[in-house]
Amino acid sequence: MPEHGHGHGHHGHGGQMTPEQQMQMMQQEIRLAKNLSQIKHKIVVMSGKGGVGKSTVAANIAETLQAMGYKTGILDADIHGPNVPKMLGIEMLEEQFNQYQFDVFKELVEKDLDTSLPEEEQREFIEEKKKEYQHSIFPVETESGLKVMSMAFLIDSLDRPIIWRGPQKTGAIKQLISDAHWGKLDFLVIDNPPGTGDEPLTVLQSIPETDLVLMVTTPNVVSQEDVLKCVKMVEMMNIKNIGLIENMAYYICPHCDETLHIFGEGNGKAFADEMEITYLGDLPIKESVAESPTKDATISVLDPDDEVSKRFVEIVEDIKKEFLE
C-alpha cells in the first residue's frame, strides 16, 4: 500500500543534507519529471493576494476543460486555503483519503493479478506492485472524470489551520507535485498559493514548461499592485506566457439580468496592456458564484446556459488560441 508520510524536508544538522536525504531528493526529482512528462499542458493560476476568487477561477477552468472532452486534473497547492475539493463537491479528509488510496491500489492489483498462478507468485506480484506504487498518491476523481489532488486530503480536520515552517510547506507542495499519480492528462490546472512567497515560487520552479501562468485580479488598485509583483516574479523566472483575468469586474442583477459596471469598465484590459501580458477577459460578480463554495459544485458545468459558464468556455477557447496553437 502506498505510504503517505507527512515528514517533509527534514534536513540534518546545520542545514546539511545526509547522503540518504540527497538520494531521496534525487529520486523525488525523477518521479516529478516522470509524472509531469505525461501531462501535455500545464496552467498555473495565481493571484497577488487572497480573496480575488483565484480558486473559483482555477476550478471552473478545470471543469470547463473536462466538459470539453480533455482529460484534466487540478492540483490545489494552496496550503493555507485548500478549498478546491469543497468547490467540486468532494468532502474527504485524511482518513477517507487513505481508504480511497487503498481502494484504488487494490483495484489496480486485481486488474492485473493472474489468480491462476501459485499463491507464492501472486504474493510476489503484489509486493512488486507495492514497490512500484509506494510513493504514489492517487488523485480523487469527480463524477465528470476530473482528477483532483489537494492539501485538504492530507489533513485530519478542515478546522485546523496548517501551521508549518517554510521548508515543511514547500516540501509538502513538492511532494504533491512529484507523487500525485495523474497518468496521462491533456491539462493540469494548478491553483497556486497567493502572493510571491516561497510557496508559489516552489510551484513555478517544480513545474518546467508551464504553458500559461494565469493571473486573477479584481478591479481594485491594491489587487492590481499585488498582481504586478507576481508578474515580475514570473518574468524573472523566464516564463513568457502570462494571461490576466479580471474577476468580479461587473455585477449581473439576479432579478433582471442587467449588467452593471459598478467599478467602471475596461480596467483589466488597460492594466494587462500596460504590463504587456495577454488579457483573457472579465468575469461577473454573481450570486451563484459567490455561493459556490457552500454549494455542491462549481457553476460552469451545472448550467451550460449560464452567463458565467459561457464566459469560462470563451476564456478556455482564448487560452487555447493564444497559447496552445
Task: Kindly label every feature range from the protein language model.
Residues K42-H80:
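Walker A/P-loop phosphate-binding motif and the immediately C-terminal alpha-helix
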Residues M149, I173, N192, Q205, ...:
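Glycine-rich phosphate-binding loops of nucleotide-dependent enzymes
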Residues K295-D306:
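C-terminal boundary of histidine-terminating zinc-finger modules
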Residues V316-E325:
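Short, hydrophobic alpha-helical segments
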